[in-house]
């Protein structure tokens, strides 16, 4: 059983998986490593690491700027894999999902990337700009090394697309609870509930809900219907706000992570 499967299946009834997102290398790779430790201490079950990219079209302003800062510091895919390998020296229970764009993976080569990700003990990969219909080659390479290929589902996703995702997705489904980019507003929990029922009829995987979760109240509301709660923009905002004060950065990220985790467990 994969690390992701273990996390989702062994959680006590009524408790939900907490998945925080941070961009690798934003404020420095050493800081990212410390942030990962803090997130684990404050309830993270899975950590999504953003792989820096020069044109993060699916991300809102907060996360897009974090990509810009990390790219400006020269952080790339190889650095992220090295970071995960370092993390694994002291943690073999928290799952790590790489979330990024297709170009760096294509440049690396699908099989070479899959092998390197496996060597670093990455658990899942989410490529935000790869259409599922074009994912077979990457899927095959990741399957060879038992790494899950995770896909996004939106309010606008058709039944036809959901049926196809049921044949190719693994790990969990990342449900975008809003129309727009990361960091958007106006979370409609009733709409999320209704759509998740539709997704569950077609895809037999855990569902994590992201976008629009701003506090413990919204996290708790979503967790009634989701298997996991995903939070990113607010954590990344703390990294930017306290870029020159590491202790405050770690403290604020830790406090917020604990608040969300406590609300859903």
From Swiss-Prot:
Lineage top rank: taxon: Bacteria
Pathway in which this enzyme or protein is active: Amino-acid biosynthesis; L-tryptophan biosynthesis; L-tryptophan from chorismate: step 5/5
Active site: 48, 59
The protein's enzyme class: lyase
GO molecular function: tryptophan synthase activity
GO cellular component term of the entry, any: cytosol
EC numbers for this chain: 4.2.1.20
Keyword Amino-acid biosynthesis: yes
Function: The alpha subunit is responsible for the aldol cleavage of indoleglycerol phosphate to indole and glyceraldehyde 3-phosphate.
Record note on quaternary structure: Tetramer of two alpha and two beta chains.
Family according to the record: Belongs to the TrpA family.
Protein name: Tryptophan synthase alpha chain
């Amino acid at each position: 059983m994969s690390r992701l499967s273990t996390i989702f299946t062994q959680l006590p009834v009524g408790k939900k998986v907490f998945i925080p997102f941070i961009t690798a290398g934003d404020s420095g790779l050493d800081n990212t490593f410390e942030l990962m430790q803090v997130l684990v201490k404050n309830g993270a079950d899975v950590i999504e690491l953003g792989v820096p990219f020069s044109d993060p079209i699916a991300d809102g302003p907060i996360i897009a700027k974090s990509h810009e800062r990390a790219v400006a510091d020269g952080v790339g895919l190889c650095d992220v894999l090295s970071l995960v390998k370092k993390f694994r020296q002291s943690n073999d229970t928290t799952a790590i999902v790489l979330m990024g764009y297709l170009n760096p993976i294509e440049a690396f080569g699908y099989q070479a990337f899959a092998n390197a990700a496996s060597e670093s003990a990455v658990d899942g990969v989410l490529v935000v700009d790869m259409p599922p219909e074009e994912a077979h080659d990457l899927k095959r390479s990741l399957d060879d090394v038992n790494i899950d290929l995770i896909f996004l589902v939106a309010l606008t996703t058709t039944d036809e697309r959901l049926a196809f995702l049921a044949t190719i997705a693994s790990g969990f489904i990342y449900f975008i609870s809003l129309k727009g980019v990361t960091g958007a507003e106006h979370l409609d929990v009733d709409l999320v509930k209704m759509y998740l029922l539709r997704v569950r009829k077609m895809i037999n995987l855990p569902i994590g809900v992201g976008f629009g979760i701003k506090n413990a109240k919204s996290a708790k509301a979503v967790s009634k219907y989701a298997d996991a709660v995903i939070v990113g923009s607010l954590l990344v905002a703390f990294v930017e706000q306290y870029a020159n004060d590491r202790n405050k950065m770690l403290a604020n990220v830790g406090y917020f992570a604990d608040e969300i985790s406590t609300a859903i467990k």
